[in-house]
Amino acid sequence: MLSFILIQNRQGKTRLAKWYVPYSDEEKIKLKGEIHRLVAPRDQKYQSNFVEFRNHKVVYRRYAGLFFCACVDTNDNELAYLEAIHFFVEVLDSFFGNVCELDLVFNFYKVYAILDEVFLAGEIEETSKQVVLTRLEHLDKLE
């Protein structure tokens, strides 16, 4: 199960945070800093995308200047979550048309809607890009 999902840039600014386990505000701030210090200096070519973190694992993937991080239980399948992160980015790309950091900042409510279509209550909910994009089209029509 997911504990949280963070999207951070190279400077450590959090662009999106979704918490599936209750944390205090102080703990959230501390976790954001720890996660960034953990994944930012890692070498993409020679180190894996999985990092042990407290009693969990952090599964992360870097796209351009953004780190997409998911904190999962130690007994969960890391590769499934790595693919789920990639799937989430593919949906963002399709929805926004070559997504960038500014899309996440200025359309954060849409990004949260996309995230909620892919993950539900800390579990992977949907794996079909077409189904997610169709649901998002229906949501866009309501606005």
Swiss-Prot record:
Q: Which GO terms describe its molecular function?
A: clathrin adaptor activity
A cellular component term from Gene Ontology for this protein is: intracellular membrane-bounded organelle
Q: Which Gene3D superfamilies match?
A: 3.30.450.60
Q: Where in the cell is it found?
A: Cell membrane; Membrane, Coated pit
Q: How does it assemble?
A: Adaptor protein complex 2 (AP-2) is a heterotetramer composed of two large adaptins (alpha-type subunit APL3 and beta-type subunit APL1), a medium chain (mu-type subunit APM4) and a small adaptin (sigma-type subunit APS2).
The job of this chain, per UniProt, is described as: Component of the adaptor complexes which link clathrin to receptors in coated vesicles. Clathrin-associated protein complexes are believed to interact with the cytoplasmic tails of membrane proteins, leading to their selection and concentration.
Which protein is depicted?
AP-2 complex subunit sigma
Q: Which organism is it from?
A: Neurospora crassa (strain ATCC 24698 / 74-OR23-1A / CBS 708.71 / DSM 1257 / FGSC 987)
